[in-house]
Amino acid sequence: MDITIVNHPLVASRLTLLRDERSDNAAFRAAANDLGAMLIYEASRDLEVEHFDTKTPVAMAEGTRLKQPPIIVPIIRAGLGMIDPALSMIPDAQVGFIGLARDEETHEPVPYLEALPQDLSNQPVFLVDPMLATGGSLLHAIRLLADRGATDITAICMVSAQPGVDALAESGLPVRLVTATIDPGLDENAYIVPGLGDAGDRLYGPRNIDL
């Protein structure tokens, strides 16, 4: 599996703000928005482009555009925080949705929503979720995408844990990973250590319903 860890001073500074327990919801969202855009930028590096003629106020020039913009697929709830930065970088991208909640006892994903194109063959997919912990949710989502024909899937995560990275690598699924960091492990509740806490709660406040 191809893994890209984005090593950049601005990435590190935003990651620090996300980790800091003093960052309130607004500060966390702002840092996540910045970091999300940086990760999308890096993930887009190898997308196919096409060239065309464009006219400047002075002369003709060669223009460049994406040949096929990716579909952005957030894993709800926390992945919603990565839609705006993704669309700011790729405004003509489509957006799909996968809803997964975590069972706090088993730590397994519980699906509750799937809104995706029926056919994803020959379509680049950016699967976005701030956290890659055990890998359970991401693997469930990747299998849904693969079942619809996706073979070009990029998982974009702000913080990844080594056990989740290992699970992805061992799955044999068609995925590459772009992340800001790989943390060493998980605690007894399957939270990333040192991590940044519950990304969904820190983006939007505590969830007050059970799914």
UniProtKB/Swiss-Prot annotation:
What's the protein here called? Uracil phosphoribosyltransferase
Which keywords does this Swiss-Prot/TrEMBL entry list? Allosteric enzyme, Glycosyltransferase, GTP-binding, Magnesium, Nucleotide-binding, Transferase
The EC code for this enzyme is: 2.4.2.9
What InterPro entries does this protein's entry cite? PRibTrfase_dom (IPR000836), PRTase-like (IPR029057), Upp_B (IPR034332), UPRTase/APRTase (IPR050054), Ura_phspho_trans (IPR005765)
The similarity annotation says: Belongs to the UPRTase family.
Instruction: Copy the pathway line from the protein's UniProt record.
Output: Pyrimidine metabolism; UMP biosynthesis via salvage pathway; UMP from uracil: step 1/1
User: Which molecular-function annotations from GO does this UniProt entry contain?
Assistant: GTP binding; magnesium ion binding; uracil phosphoribosyltransferase activity
What highest taxon heads this organism's lineage? Answer: Bacteria
At the highest ranks, the source species' classification is: Bacteria, Bacillati, Actinomycetota, Actinomycetes, Mycobacteriales
